[in-house]
């Protein structure tokens, strides 16, 4: 009875084949890493300036 959850969860963890809806990237698509980096940069620029900590204000 202990193995029953394993047999239920294991098939969910196995990656499936790409679906038919998968489409190649277009010119307008932005890679997720680039979007994440841009978001971090915007958050960094919005931080309040703290003159007592070197390198805080850029």
Swiss-Prot record:
<feature type="propeptide">
    <location>
        <begin position="23"/>
        <end position="47"/>
    </location>
</feature>
<keyword id="KW-1015">Disulfide bond</keyword>
<dbReference type="GO" id="GO:0090729">
    <property type="term" value="F:toxin activity"/>
</dbReference>
<keyword id="KW-0800">Toxin</keyword>
<protein>
    <recommendedName>
        <fullName>Conotoxin Leo-T2</fullName>
    </recommendedName>
</protein>
<feature type="signal peptide">
    <location>
        <begin position="1"/>
        <end position="22"/>
    </location>
</feature>
<dbReference type="GO" id="GO:0005576">
    <property type="term" value="C:extracellular region"/>
</dbReference>
<dbReference type="Pfam" id="PF16981">
    <property type="entry name" value="Chi-conotoxin"/>
</dbReference>
<comment type="similarity">
    <text>Belongs to the conotoxin T superfamily.</text>
</comment>
<dbReference type="InterPro" id="IPR031565">
    <property type="entry name" value="T-conotoxin"/>
</dbReference>
<keyword id="KW-0732">Signal</keyword>
<keyword id="KW-0165">Cleavage on pair of basic residues</keyword>
<keyword id="KW-0964">Secreted</keyword>
């Amino acid at each position: 009875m202990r193995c029953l959850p394993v047999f239920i969860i294991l098939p969910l963890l196995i990656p499936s084949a790409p679906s038919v809806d998968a489409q190649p990237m277009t010119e307008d698509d932005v890679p997720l890493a680039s979007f994440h980096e841009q978001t971090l940069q915007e958050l960094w620029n919005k931080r309040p300036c703290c003159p007592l900590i070197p390198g805080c204000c850029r």
